[in-house]
């Protein structure tokens, strides 16, 4: 009986941790600063993200995040798209939000486009080297529990 109660408690706490992670992930991802670095190809200095330790700790980890699928030219596939903390009219590409509020997504299975908030689960990769890509990349993504 003790083992059953202990197992149930651990299971419930783990579920709470994922929910808390989902709620705070975009907030954590906003903990960045920038430094200027010379880009050889462009011939001038560009802003490069400097990730906080909290963000670095998430590198390569499976995370769950809620947000909106952004229809962006060049990301037409249902397995490759941009994901935003905010709806399309408020996201980074339409003004107002910063680059830390969007991520590139590569999914395992095609994910149907929706204008509603959806939840994704995948492995987070950080990008501070390639200025032609977003700073956050979610790979092996799939719809998370409680997704709409």
Predicted regions and their residues:
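Sec-dependent N-terminal signal peptides
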Residues: 3-14
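OB-fold and OB-like single-stranded nucleic-acid-recognition modules
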Residues: 20-148
């Amino acid at each position: 009986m003790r083992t059953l109660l202990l197992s149930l408690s651990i299971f419930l706490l783990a579920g709470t941790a994922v929910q808390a992670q989902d709620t705070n992930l975009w907030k954590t991802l906003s903990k960045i600063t920038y430094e200027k670095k010379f880009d050889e190809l462009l011939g001038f200095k560009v802003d490069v993200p400097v990730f906080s330790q909290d963000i670095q700790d998430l590198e390569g980890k499976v995370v769950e995040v809620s947000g909106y699928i952004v229809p962006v030219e060049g990301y037409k596939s249902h397995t490759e798209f941009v994901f935003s903390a905010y709806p399309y009219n408020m996201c980074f590409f339409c003004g107002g939000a910063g680059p830390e509020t969007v991520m590139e997504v590569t999914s395992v299975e095609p994910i149907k486009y929706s204008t509603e908030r959806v939840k994704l689960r995948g492995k987070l990769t950080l990008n501070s080297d390639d200025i032609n890509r977003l700073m956050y990349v979610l790979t092996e993504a799939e719809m998370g529990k409680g997704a709409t």
